[in-house]
């Protein structure tokens, strides 16, 4: 866990541009390290997860860009697009935080078909209507990496179906701020 003294934050605010550039540099280094681990794992699926608001989508997009700059073909999926329609949810799916809200079979099927090099209809979820709002085509490749990001990607209900082919990545802001009282 990173620890920052409150006084250092105050000093950093005197040069906001430098502070932002340093934060970006730290983030880039973490993306670079994650990409290296993913490439060395020889596993074609990245299951990226973290709590709500942790930066999963941003991290997944940055990881995708980084890998593509290395010449790797990447397919990026958001688990949010694989939610079941509200009227088809089982009783266990009490809220959006429940893994039972996810159409796991469709998610796993799309991942598998992308890795087989097939063109796949990827759903997009309409949260206002509470159902799939349509589909967009995505072309897979035999040697591609599929990054699937979402709050439940490391949940055993999902991860156990892809475990042998997946690298798990957990994203969370973990910075402790020290005040004069600490």
Where are the language model's segments positioned?
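Walker A (P-loop) phosphate-binding loop of P-loop NTPases
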Residues: 53
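Conserved lysine of the Walker
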Residues: 56
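Charged, amphipathic alpha-helical linker segments immediately N-terminal to NTP-binding catalytic cores
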Residues: 1-33
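Hydrophobic anchor at the beta1->P-loop junction of P-loop NTPases
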Residues: 46-48
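ATP-dependent NMP and nucleoside kinases share a basic, alpha-helical "lid"
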Residues: 142-143, 148-182
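Post-Walker A helix-loop "phosphate-sensing" segment adjacent to the P-loop in P-loop NTPases
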Residues: 65-75
